[in-house]
Amino acid sequence: MAKEDSIRMQGVIVDTLPNTMFRVELENGHVVTAHISGKMRKHYIRILTGDKVTVELTPYDLNKGRIVYRER
């Protein structure tokens, strides 16, 4: 997946799932399942319920995404 093909949206973590997966409610109201990107995993960035995050979605599957940034 090329970076220019991805869709970035803001959201809030609603639920924590096993295997570092999270349920994220996007700003438009949709709920998606997202995992942490590799750089966030490498730097041990912790994500908790209620955190504001930026999620990358692919145009092919809008139900799954990748968390690329956590707001401070």
UniProtKB/Swiss-Prot annotation:
It is found in: Cytoplasm. One of its GO terms (cellular component) is cytosol. Keywords: Cytoplasm, Initiation factor, Protein biosynthesis, RNA-binding, rRNA-binding. Residues 1-72 form the S1-like domain. InterPro entries: NA-bd_OB-fold (IPR012340), RNA-binding_domain_S1_IF1 (IPR006196), S1_domain (IPR003029), TIF_IF1 (IPR004368). The keyword Phosphoprotein does not apply. Its main location: cytoplasm. SMART domains: S1 (SM00316). Gene3D superfamilies: Nucleic acid-binding proteins. GO terms for molecular function: ribosome binding; rRNA binding; translation initiation factor activity. It comes from the Bacteria. It holds the Pfam family eIF-1a. Component of the 30S ribosomal translation pre-initiation complex which assembles on the 30S ribosome in the order IF-2 and IF-3, IF-1 and N-formylmethionyl-tRNA(fMet); mRNA recruitment can occur at any time during PIC assembly. Belongs to the IF-1 family. NCBIfam families: infA. One of the essential components for the initiation of protein synthesis. Stabilizes the binding of IF-2 and IF-3 on the 30S subunit to which N-formylmethionyl-tRNA(fMet) subsequently binds. Helps modulate mRNA selection, yielding the 30S pre-initiation complex (PIC). Upon addition of the 50S ribosomal subunit IF-1, IF-2 and IF-3 are released leaving the mature 70S translation initiation complex. HAMAP family: IF_1. This is Translation initiation factor IF-1. The gene is infA.
